[in-house]
Design a protein with these regions (language model features):
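A short beta-strand/loop micro-motif in the catalytic core of glycosyltransferases
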Residues: 81-82, 107-108, 165
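Gly/Ser/Thr-rich phosphate-binding loop
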Residues: 93-150
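Alpha-helix/helix-capping structural signal
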Residues: 15, 86, 112-113, 178
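AMP-binding/adenylate-forming
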Residues: 11-19, 35-90
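Short helix-loop-beta connector
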Residues: 30-34
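Conserved adenylation A10 loop of the ANL superfamily
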Residues: 1-9, 136
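Short, well-ordered beta-strand segments
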Residues: 37, 172-173
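Conserved ATP-binding loop and adjacent catalytic segment of the adenylate-forming AMP-binding
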Residues: 127-170, 176-182
Length: 183
């Protein structure tokens, strides 16, 4: 992915991308006609998967140039958005952008860790916010953690078809047969 080194090419099957999109859309209850914000670069799996989710679920994709302030010119309510922590942090610094963020029903945050200060601010938001766990090789995320509201949790919940275990040297083994060929 490039987050820990030089990015390299990977090959995935379309079916795996469709499966990943369905897992997310089903888990979050996304339906045809819901407005979803694409505000991440298409050269990364996160941006690509937003497009695939919109195609699979029939979402109305609202496309914005990737920036540190994705809510700066949004003038409509959105059902779903995916952002990186820096985008969320920047958005919360500007009152008008924060107000627009609060009009999103569901926000997923991935691509980096969420520090304690940001997580505390997220807990005050009146929308559903999730942190994602995954990587390029799992076609974005395979687990979600609710960050706010009555269902907030300190733990990630893997999608139903995903099995997690530890190897003999205590490294994580991810068995996600719908989205990857390897564990």
């Amino acid at each position: 992915s490039g987050s820990t080194g030089t990015p390299k090419r990977i090959m995935v099957r379309k079916e795996q991308m469709v499966n990943s999109a369905r897992l997310t859309c089903d888990y979050l209850g996304l339906r045809q006609g819901d407005k979803a914000l694409l505000c991440m670069p298409l050269r990364y799996i996160a941006g690509k998967m937003m497009v695939v989710r919109s195609l699979v679920a029939g979402l109305d994709l609202v496309i914005r140039e990737p920036s540190g302030h994705p809510m700066a010119d949004i003038d409509m309510p959105l059902r779903f958005a995916a952002m990186i922590p820096l985008q969320v942090y920047n958005t919360l610094q500007v009152p008008e952008e924060r107000e627009r963020l609060c009009q999103i029903d569901i926000l997923i945050i991935g691509g980096g860790s969420i520090d304690h200060e940001l997580e505390t601010r997220i807990q005050e938001l009146p929308i559903c916010v999730y942190s994602t766990y995954g990587m390029t090789e799992t076609l974005s995320h395979i687990a979600l953690r609710r960050l706010n509201g009555p269902d907030a949790s300190p733990y990630y919940t893997p999608f139903p078809s995903v099995k997690l275990s530890l190897s003999t040297d205590d490294t994580l083994i991810i068995d996600a047969p719908l989205v990857t060929d390897e564990t």
